[in-house]
Amino acid sequence: TQFYEHCPPFVTAESIRDDMCALPQRKMDEPQDKYYLGFFDDAEQLVAVMDFIDHYPTEQSCFIGFFMMERSVQGHGIGSRIITELCVYLHSLGYEYIRLGYVDGNKQSESFWKKNQFTDTGLRNHTQDYTVVVMNRML
């Protein structure tokens, strides 16, 4: 997928298993706060997957590790509806904001998140292979 064009290495069964357990250092003792969420259409076909960490980076926030849409349903507003519904739900629970990051240079991700009211925090996380632009959406 386009995600892996900007964020190597390419996906393998092992990398998926590793990612499903990966947590930031401060959350290593709280694996119960890590979720993989699947979103299905009316025909019960998986159309999106989200990596979600509850109560991170603060107790009143959450973190989207990634959000991937099936290519065939991109551009139809489904992803934005999912994000909007998630934001409404989290706000109703008292959360203050959602944080996420996208790989610098991934224009599709940048555009999607900006369209969905996420703003650049000015923070950058640098890895050996890429730079992550950190964004927040206040709820």
Language-model segment annotations:
Residues 70-72, 76, 104-105:
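Active-site acidic-Proline motif in GNAT/NAT acetyltransferases
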Residues 100-110, 126-131:
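Conserved beta-strand-loop-alpha-helix junction that forms the acyl-donor binding cleft
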Residues 1-72, 83-85, 89, 93, ...:
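Acetyl-CoA-dependent GNAT
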Residues 76, 93-96:
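Short coil/turn segments at alpha/beta junctions that flank glycine-rich nucleotide-binding fingerprints
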Residues 114-122:
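Conserved acetyl-CoA-binding loop of GNAT-fold acetyltransferases
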Residues 80:
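Residues forming the Rossmann-fold NAD(P)(H) cofactor-binding site
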Residues 86-90, 98, 109:
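Short hydrophobic clusters on alpha-helical segments that form packing/core surfaces
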